């Protein structure tokens, strides 16, 4: 029952559409991959254990699922190879062992920039570490829920959703104040600030109150 609940949470958080490609890293025998196949345009599973990959392919055939592919290899290295070949998943599911994601996997996720990452974890410590690394790469932790797959012990399975921040609404602008007010007396005017931001970023400052909220000026 708890395993079914975990899969339902992962599917719900992924918010998959028929236009989406889903990449499932550390997919095992393809349980989560195949559970998402019906809602997605295409699903891709990656697993390092050869027999598990064969079982995943057999499970797809037995269930009449034709939009699933499975690859055998290290999750991080395989993800980097898929990225180099042009694969750009909309949703990525990761279900790593207790040691969490390796550096290659973090880098692959950063390069692929899926809009959603569903992280299934069996170790809260490595989960916290990896979430912090993904936040540095543009993701926001939206939800976290627990599933008691290990009753009568301290271990817990956690399902987290990380969402890519909108690059249009989150832009870092390096402002050289000295350059902005060079040859000007006193503080820069609001008009000068708007012109400077427009020149440097192509964005229009819509309201003075928004600028004040950010800068205090």
Label each region the model flagged.
Residues 189-201, 212-216:
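DNA-recognition alpha helix
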Residues 209:
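Residues in the helix-turn-helix
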Residues 139, 202-203:
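Short aromatic/hydrophobic-glycine micro-motifs
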Residues 1-186, 191:
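Rossmann-like S-adenosyl-L-methionine
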